[in-house]
Amino acid sequence: MPSGCRCLHLVCLLCILAAPVKPVRADDCSSHCDLAHGCCAPDGSCRCDPGWEGLHCERCVRMPGCQHGTCHQPWQCICHSGWAGKFCDKDEHVCTTQSPCRNGGQCIYDGGGEYHCVCPPGFHGRDCERKEGPCEQAGSPCRNGGQCQDDQGFALNYTCRCLAGFVGAHCEVNVDDCLMRPCANGATCLDGINRFSCLCPEGFAGRFCTINLDDCASRPCQRGARCRDRVHDFDCLCPSGYGGKTCELVLPVPDPATTADIPPGPTLAVVVPATGPIPHSAGAGLLRISVKEVVRRQEAGLGKSSLVAVVVFGAVTATLVLSTVLLTLRAWRRGVCPPGPCCYPAPHYAPARQDQECQVSMLPAGLPLPPDLPPEPGKTTAL
């Protein structure tokens, strides 16, 4: 150990070992360092023990937060006169120096730096700072956790500060979070407090039920068939020779002798009953058909020839109707009567009333002319 250092603690020993060694006079440190609370370092300075401070390690460290106090040992807080409390932060003369009670309240000292206020009528609070305003008079009118505000009682009316998800004068209305219809694909929206949830139908998932579940994820199709996902369903595109929902069925192989003349594509076979006299053979008495009479209907609907026939028939019908209407209108404008007993193409005038205007009326069929207006051949006037 270097000369001139007398250490009484293990901490100081570690300090000495870590410090660089240099020659120091023995009386440079020991003469002024408080060796009860520290030790001399090789550089001649005092190294204080934990809880002590100062140039010579002569001062203890107070409790953190101690305001008006001192210590005799480390981490103490001994209050000065007139102060109290754990941190010596409470004034024992609080009611005499400057009363904390407001609005005319009376301060009562309880000892240990504590006090209480006796408030006048109409006021309350620790320091009589609150007035019995609209909130107190209404008796906590705000609902669903709302906070009543009346400017500490000095406002004329109160207001309710509502929590998220509620509205109204007293926070009594729960906001309908399903009003905007956030759930998709026919899902049911369940309203909550400032939130909603979607009850998804089968085949959908997600917060808004927008995810179509993959029904092909479990690989339901057999025989190596390709799966096509649908809404809560799937289709299997089966290879040739297989059928069924999951291609689990093996289709029978058709007889080439009976299907050689059948065109490709899906067909519907219908057996046509025989008509006319039926030849009988001796013994059996059954119908003998050498060639099967089969009618096959393609699924494509009308053929091209049938569609053309329908269009031509419609055009001819429309032309005939239009021609008949035009001819009838033309004959009516020229005064030509069609064959029939109810039309008189030209009016008749009496000889004595020629060159005068007359009202023309149509006579019923078979009605004779008046005797004073006999018809005069060659004396007619066209309309």
Swiss-Prot record:
Residues 1-26 form the signal peptide. It is a single-pass type I membrane protein. Residues 328-383 are cytoplasmic. Keywords: Calcium, Disulfide bond, EGF-like domain, Glycoprotein, Membrane, Repeat, Signal, Transmembrane, Transmembrane helix. Residues 27-58, 62-89, 91-129, 131-172, 174-210, 212-248 form the EGF-like domain. GO terms for biological process: negative regulation of Notch signaling pathway; regulation of fat cell differentiation. Disulfide bonds join 29-40, 33-46, 48-57, 66-71, 79-88, 95-107, 101-117, 119-128, 135-148, 142-160, 162-171, 178-189, 183-198, 200-209, 216-227, 221-236, 238-247. Glycans are attached at residue 157. PROSITE patterns: ASX_HYDROXYL, EGF_1, EGF_2, EGF_3, EGF_CA. Gene3D superfamilies: Laminin. This is Protein delta homolog 2.
